[in-house]
A protein has these predicted regions:
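Short loop/turn segments immediately following beta-strands, especially the blade-tip
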Residues: 9-15, 52-59, 97-108, 156-164, ...
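Asp-box/WD-like beta-propeller blade repeats and closely related beta-sheet repeat scaffolds
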Residues: 61-133
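Beta-rich, blade/repeat-based domains predominating
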Residues: 26-36, 69-80, 117-138, 173-188, ...
């Protein structure tokens, strides 16, 4: 979160706790992602992006860094073959595509740069493009780019050889909904988009027909107890390791909301929406066993921990909070043998 960079923790699944193991110094690491082969970690920095090899003991070994030729990014992801790295630009409304070395993980040259264009609805934050998330469809054909400034999710076909994007569709979200993050279901058939200002998750079906992507809205479900109330902003969106649950966090209300995913229909059923004993939950995630939950509270500089009672549909505070300065992002990673 702070200038000290990336903290590495050992995970105690039984107790639902984290123990600090190491710290990697890096300038303002605001978001990290792990390659789909599990070998490399990529981080946003003030300079651009940096790559680290994940060592057998979980430590990080610096590989290289690369410029994104623009203002600092806010979100990173890779395609499912780990051939390209995508960086979302909140401040300049730009998608940057960089080539990856699949053997070393090193970040290479920029293969494409696309600026979103358009106007939002109000003459404040939402009057120009702010790309907040970029994710590939699970069939590795299309890149979806959420833009909370103009209430669109732009869809691009990825040229797998050249790393070039070609726009083929637009998902038009509700006016002033501010699509912030998106996730695909484990089978790739459903898309979940959380609206920062709408405080709602929109569920879409996804399929390809005649070489084109199709997205159809099938559900909208609130993330908060007070639907569309001012002063509340949906922030994180994470799917559990087994794909059975989806978790959203809400700033302002300072709560987390857990939903169960219908494996056939893709629709969501809310289990609970409860406070996280901290301020501005920038990110939140279930432990890999789904029995515990952690919230990263950006404004109170804490991580808070909870036991998840699936029968009673509630969470219970689990021991003391951990102090951490301005935490932004958390990822659980199972070390490879």
């Amino acid at each position: 979160g702070d200038n000290h960079g990336i903290k590495i923790y050992d995970v105690d699944l039984e107790e639902g706790r984290l123990t600090e193991k190491a710290e990697v110094e890096i300038t303002n690491s605001s978001y990290v992602t792990i390659s789909h082969n599990g070998k490399f970690l990529y981080s946003i920095t003030d300079f651009g992006v940096e790559c680290f090899q994940i060592m057998p003991d979980g430590d990080l070994n610096f590989v290289n860094k690369a410029s994104i030729n623009g203002m600092r990014g806010c979100y990173l992801s890779t395609d499912y073959d780990d051939k390209f790295l995508f960086c979302a630009g909140y401040h300049d409304g730009k998608i940057t595509v960089l080539r990856l070395n699949r053997e070393t993980g090193a970040v290479g040259e920029i293969t494409d740069e696309i600026y979103h264009r358009g106007l939002g609805s109000v003459a404040e934050r939402s009057f120009r493009p702010h790309i907040s998330c970029v994710k590939m469809t699970r069939d590795n054909k299309y890149l979806c780019a959420a833009d909370l400034g103009i209430d669109y999710v732009n869809v691009y076909r990825l040229n797998q050889e050249r790393g070039v994007l070609n726009q083929v569709d637009i998902i038009r979200c509700d006016l002033n909904s501010a699509p912030r993050h998106l996730k695909f279901s484990e089978d790739g058939k459903f898309l979940y988009i959380v609206g920062e200002l709408k405080n709602c998750i929109d569920v879409y079906t996804y399929h390809e027909e005649n070489g084109l992507p199709f997205f159809d809205l099938i559900q909208s479900i609130p993330t908060t107890n007070r639907y569309q109330m001012q002063g509340i902003a949906a922030s994180a969106l994470n799917i559990s390791a087994d794909g059975k649950y989806i978790l959203a966090s809400n700033a302002g209300e300072n709560s987390v909301t857990l939903f169960e995913i219908d494996p056939e229909k893709g629709t969501l059923t809310r289990m609970f929406c409860l406070p996280i004993s901290g301020e501005y939950p920038k990110d939140a995630a279930l432990f890999p066993d789904n029995q515990h939950l952690v919230s990263l509270n950006h404004e109170s500089d804490t991580m808070t921990f909870f036991k998840v009672d699936h029968d009673m549909k509630c969470i219970v505070m689990n021991q003391k909070e951990i102090k951490i300065k301005q935490a932004n992002c958390i990822i659980f990673h199972l070390l490879q043998d």
